[in-house]
Amino acid sequence: MNRNFSPAAMPPISSMTIDNSFSPPPSSGDLPEIPDAWYGNIQYLLNISVIGLLCCVSIFLFVKLRSDHRRMPGPSALFSKLLAVWKATCREIARHCGADAAQFLLIEGGSFVLLFSIAVLAVSVMLPLNLYAGTALLSDELSKTMITHIQKGSALLWLHFVFVVIVVVISHFGIAAIEARLKFTRFRDGNGNISDPNANSTAVFTIMVQGLPKNLGSDRVEFEDCFRLKYPGKVYKFIVPMDLCALDDLATELVRVRDEITWLVAKMDSRLLPDEYENVGDNGLVFCVCSLWVRVKVLWSQITERFGFTDDEKLRKLQELRADLESQLAAYKEGRAQGAGVAFVMFKDVYTANKAVQDFRNERSRRTGKFFSVTELRLQRNQWKVDRAPLATDIYWNHLGLTKVALIVRRVIVNTILLLILVFFSSPLALISALVSAGRIFNAEALDSAQYWLTWVQTSGWIGSLIFQFLPNVFIFVSMYIVIPSALSYLSKFERHLTVSGEQRAALLKMVCFFLVNLIILKALVESSLESALLKMSRCYLDGEDCKRIEEYMSPSFLSRSCVSALAFLITSTFLGISFDLLAPIPWIKKKIQKFRKNDMLQLVPEQNEEYALENQEPSSNLETPLLPENMFESPRFGDIEPMSQDLSEYPISRTSPIPKQKFDFAQYYAFNLTIFALTMIYSSFAPLVVPVGAVYFGYRYIVDKYNFLYVYRVRGFPAGNEGKLMDTVLCIMRFCVDLYLVSMLLFFSVKGDSTKLQAIFTLGVLVMYKLLPSDTDRYHPALLRSIQTVDSIIDGPVDYEAYSHPNFDWDTYNNR
C-alpha cells in the first residue's frame, strides 16, 4: 500500500475491480494546485461531520423526543426536561439506574474535566509555540500546529518536556479525584448514603473461600470449626452451596429427555391411527407418490428393526436415562449432592471480615515450608483462595461448581482465538489489504493505472475527503463499535466467569486490547494488520544498516500522517458516534416491535406506563421492584424465553443470576471511552488540537449518556451500590494510558531530542516516579467501617447468599402430578 497519500487513506475497494481499459488520468496541468491546503483535508471532514451532527440532532428533536416522552414536548417542557437531566445528581442516577450507571457518568465527567484542563494549556501555550516558534520546512498548515514543526534538537523541546510533566501531574491528581469520588459508590448509593434500604449489602461482612473439596457439602463440621476457633464469637453464618453448575446441566438434560420421551410416545401412538393416505383415490400421480412413500417407510422400519434401532428400544433407553437423571436430581432435593467447592463465611462485623481476608492472604504468602495438620490437608487448606465476597446479585449461581481445569481450557481457547485474530486479522482493513495484494498478483497493471486515478481523486477536496477519510473512519467505527464488541462479549460469556462483574472485566480487557491495537498502534504505524507491523519491525534486527524503522516512525511526515489519522478518527467519533448514541436506535426499534406484539395472545396483562418524568418523581414513588420475582425458577428454561407480558422498563431476570440483564453494554462503552482517552493522551504533545477534540468528546458523551440513562435505559431492579471491581479495572487502564503517553514521548525525545539525550532520560525518570506514586487501593472507604458496626443492623430476614444458593425445584412438576 502506497503511504505517500493521505494518512487516513485506506486500501481502496474500487481499485480491486479496475482493469487495463482505464483511460489515462487528467494531466498534471489540469490538477488544481493547493500549496497551503490542510493536510488530509481535515476541514472537509469537519464539515461533513458537522452536517451529520446536525442531521442526528434534528432527528432527535423532531422524532426521538416523541418516542421517549409519548408526545412532542413544547419548548418550555423540552427545556425543563433537559434542565432536569443536567441537574440530576449522582444519587438519583444510582437510585433509578443503578450504581454502574452512576460510576460510568462519574468517570466520563471526570475525564472531561481532566482533558479540559490539559486542553486549555495545550491550546493556549503549546499550539502557539508549535505554530509560530517552529522553523521546520513543512508543506501544509496543519502540520505546522504539531511538534514536527520544531526542528530536531531545538531548545524549544524543553518546553514540551515541561508540558509532559504538567500533563502527568494533572492526570495523576485527576484520576485520584475520580477514584475518591467513586469510593462512595461501593455498596452505597451515589453519595455514600446508607439511608437507602436498597443500598444495604451483606457483602461487606462476607468472605468467599474457593478451592474446597467438593465432598464438603455433606460434612462441613471441620470447616466450620476451623473458622470458629480462629475467630471465636465473630462468625455469623456459613453458606456452602451445592454444585449448581452440575445441577443446571442436569436440569437441562432432564427436561430434554422428558421432551423426547413425550414426542416419541406421541409418534408411536400415531401409528395406531388410520393412514392419512387411505382417503386418496386409486388413480393419479398423487396416489402413486403416496404408495411409494408408504413402501419406503415400511422398508425403513424393517431395516431399523433388524439392526435394533426400533422406537421401542429407543424409548427404553430414554426411560432408563430419565430414571438415572431423576435419581441424581433426588440427591440435590435431599441435600446429599456434592458441594461446589466454594463457601461463603459471614462475620458479625466488617472489621473481622477484613481481618480474615488479610490473615489468609498473609498465610498464603508465607506458605512455603509450612506443615499442615491432617484436618487441614483433608480440607485442602493449601489450595484455598480467600477473598472478599462479591454481591449475591453479582454471582452467576449456575456457574458454581465448574472445575478449575474446565475454566482454564475455556480461557485458553478464547485467548488463543483472540491472539490469532489480533495478529493476522487485527483490523477489518487487513482483509482489504489482502484483496489488494491478491489483485496485484493477478493484474498489477490495472492497479497501477487505478493508482494514478486515486492520486487525482485525493486532490479533489470534498470527494477525496469523503472517500479517503470519512468513509474509512465510518467503516472502522461501525466494525469496532458494533461487530467486534458483540463477538468479544460472546467470547467472554463462553469463559463462564463466576460473577457478572468478572465477565464485564474480561470483556473490557479484550475490547481495550483490540481497540488499542487497531485504533492506536496500527493507525500510528499506518498499517492494516499487526502481522505486517511485526514483520517490518523484525527487519530492523535482520538488516540493521538498511532499516532505521524507529527513526522513520518519528520522521515529520510519518508523525504528521499519524497525528492527522488520529484527529480524523476523533472528529468522526465525536460528532457522528455520539450523535448516533443520542438517537439510541436499537432500544427504539425494540420498543416499536414490542408495540406491534401488544395484541399477541401471550400478552395477558395490559401495557404499563413507561414514562418516567424525572421532575415528577417523588421519593416515595415505587421505582424499585424486587430483584427476584416469585416465579423466577418456575422453569429451568426461563432464561431462554423472555416473557411477552414483561414491562419494557424492567429488565428480564434470568435463572443464571438474580441481577437484571443489562441492555447498556458498560464494558463496550468503557472500552471505547478508554481508547479515546488513550488516543487523546498519546497525541496531546504531538498534536495539541487533538486534546480539545477529546475533551469535547467526553463532555458531549456525558450529556448524551445522562439523558439516555434517565429516559431510555432507565430501569427498575438495579442495586444502588456495588463492590466497584469494574471501575477499579477502568482506573487501572486510565493510569496505563498515562504510561503509554510517557513511553511515546520517551521514544520521541530519544530520536528528536537534544544530542545529550537529557530529555529522554528525564522523561524516563518521570515515568519511574509516576509508577512509584502511591495509589489508594483499599476497596473500603473508612466512612463505611464507621457507619456499619454489626451485621444485625443490615439483615432483616433471610440472608441473600443463602436464599440464592438454595435451588428451587418448583419447576419439576413431572413428579408433582
UniProtKB/Swiss-Prot annotation:
<feature type="transmembrane region" description="Helical">
    <location>
        <begin position="676"/>
        <end position="696"/>
    </location>
</feature>
<feature type="transmembrane region" description="Helical">
    <location>
        <begin position="412"/>
        <end position="432"/>
    </location>
</feature>
<dbReference type="GO" id="GO:0006623">
    <property type="term" value="P:protein targeting to vacuole"/>
</dbReference>
<dbReference type="Pfam" id="PF14703">
    <property type="entry name" value="PHM7_cyt"/>
</dbReference>
<keyword id="KW-0472">Membrane</keyword>
<keyword id="KW-0813">Transport</keyword>
<keyword id="KW-0106">Calcium</keyword>
<keyword id="KW-0812">Transmembrane</keyword>
<keyword id="KW-1133">Transmembrane helix</keyword>
<feature type="transmembrane region" description="Helical">
    <location>
        <begin position="729"/>
        <end position="749"/>
    </location>
</feature>
<keyword id="KW-0406">Ion transport</keyword>
<feature type="transmembrane region" description="Helical">
    <location>
        <begin position="155"/>
        <end position="175"/>
    </location>
</feature>
<feature type="transmembrane region" description="Helical">
    <location>
        <begin position="569"/>
        <end position="589"/>
    </location>
</feature>
<dbReference type="InterPro" id="IPR045122">
    <property type="entry name" value="Csc1-like"/>
</dbReference>
<protein>
    <recommendedName>
        <fullName>Hyperosmolality-gated Ca2+ permeable channel 4.1</fullName>
    </recommendedName>
</protein>
<feature type="transmembrane region" description="Helical">
    <location>
        <begin position="463"/>
        <end position="483"/>
    </location>
</feature>
<dbReference type="InterPro" id="IPR027815">
    <property type="entry name" value="CSC1/OSCA1-like_cyt"/>
</dbReference>
<feature type="transmembrane region" description="Helical">
    <location>
        <begin position="109"/>
        <end position="129"/>
    </location>
</feature>
<feature type="transmembrane region" description="Helical">
    <location>
        <begin position="42"/>
        <end position="62"/>
    </location>
</feature>
<dbReference type="GO" id="GO:0005227">
    <property type="term" value="F:calcium-activated cation channel activity"/>
</dbReference>
<dbReference type="InterPro" id="IPR032880">
    <property type="entry name" value="Csc1/OSCA1-like_N"/>
</dbReference>
<dbReference type="Pfam" id="PF13967">
    <property type="entry name" value="RSN1_TM"/>
</dbReference>
<dbReference type="GO" id="GO:0016020">
    <property type="term" value="C:membrane"/>
</dbReference>
<keyword id="KW-0407">Ion channel</keyword>
<comment type="similarity">
    <text>Belongs to the CSC1 (TC 1.A.17) family.</text>
</comment>
<feature type="transmembrane region" description="Helical">
    <location>
        <begin position="506"/>
        <end position="526"/>
    </location>
</feature>
<comment type="function">
    <text>Acts as an osmosensitive calcium-permeable cation channel.</text>
</comment>
<dbReference type="Pfam" id="PF02714">
    <property type="entry name" value="RSN1_7TM"/>
</dbReference>
<dbReference type="InterPro" id="IPR003864">
    <property type="entry name" value="CSC1/OSCA1-like_7TM"/>
</dbReference>
